[in-house]
Amino acid sequence: MKIFNSLDWKQRKTIILHDTFLYKGWGERLILMMAKALDCDIASGFFSRGSFNLRDEGFQGKMIEVSSEVFKKGYRHLKLKQAFLFKTKFLQDYDTVIFSWDCISAIRNCSPDSKKIYYCHTPPRYLYDLRDEYLKKIPSYIKPAFNLVSWAFRKMYEKEVKKFDVILSNSINTWKRLHHFTWEESQVLYPPVELDKFQWIDQWDYYLSVSRLSTAKRIDNIVKAFKQMPDKKLVVIYGINDPQKEEIFELAKDCKNIEFITCPWNEWFTDYVWKSIAWICIPIDEDFWMVPVESMSAWKPVIWVDEGWIKESVINGETWVLIPEWWAVEDIIKAVEYLTPQVALSMKTRCIERAQDFSYSEFEKKIREFVK
């Protein structure tokens, strides 16, 4: 049993260690909101120019970078693993350390008396449920090394995850996955949405995709569907560091009804959200994603695939349109054709009612309780 000193959360010196600020993603934005709620510091492998500028977003705490920016995925994992193991001695200075994403090897550098919290977005998918997908992309001569390293990293992860005082999962889906792979128990704490940033303004003539251009998000299939619907317009918002960017650009070449836009979070983004017909998201077994909740906050329904955490957040036929788990591009087309501007408008009241359950104020209250 470990007994923590009875400090108020404001008195506890707290830091969040997040693996990388590489993208303008929902994981990165969650850490920013969490840090503001706790008035704490942030450490990361690196802070990329392609991610949020935390100072511009109002973050005033200390920022600690333990490595340097690197894009090549396999090398990045190895370099960051070394940095988290050997360059995080500063964690000893904190009363509470919150770990986010793939950085928990640094737990060995925390003070024995500190409170260690793991906010689990998912067990590393390249080590577990999507391991075979990653393996397919690796040249044959590298596969033996990948198998050896991934085996070692899995053993490390399963040993390290047992050292936490508190484990939080971002959804029931993540709770199940973490328990399945590690047998560890956790408590569910849904990420928040800043509801005041989203509102219904108007409805224009386009559907919206707001996802990283990567294999796991399956944006290529959304593009394929809209290539067959030249009368329907698609706007894709992406990040400059997205790994599948060039491939998807080439796929959409000469399609006048598909537009790609990259923009900082606080510039133009909400304008595109407010004026869309609906959002389209078909990721692979997603753990938690703010996309559908933010969409509902803007009174916009979602087209989603019948897998992952989404069943926890939206109501079929009232706040979303569902495509089958074993879907084809034709199912995306059918969903878009069904979700006309008129049908989307009829869903807007239920959308905003459901989004209220994911408010920032509720998240702020709960995360402060866990830090005590």
Feature map (PLM): residue ranges:
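Active-site donor-binding segments of glycosyltransferases and PAPS-dependent sulfotransferases
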Residues: D41-I107
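A charged, aromatic-enriched C-terminal amphipathic alpha-helix characteristic of glycosyltransferases
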Residues: L78-K81, P341, L345-V371
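Membrane-proximal helix-turn-helix segments that form the acceptor-binding/catalytic region
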Residues: L135-I167, K176
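Conserved donor-binding/catalytic core segment of Leloir-type glycosyltransferases
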Residues: Q199-K217, V223-M229, L234-I237
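Nucleotide-activated donor-binding/catalytic signature segment of Leloir-type glycosyltransferases, i.e.
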Residues: K245-T270
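Aromatic "clamp/platform" in nucleotide-sugar-dependent glycosyltransferases that forms part
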Residues: I284
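Short hydrophobic beta-strand element within catalytic cores of glycosyltransferases
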Residues: P301-V305, V314
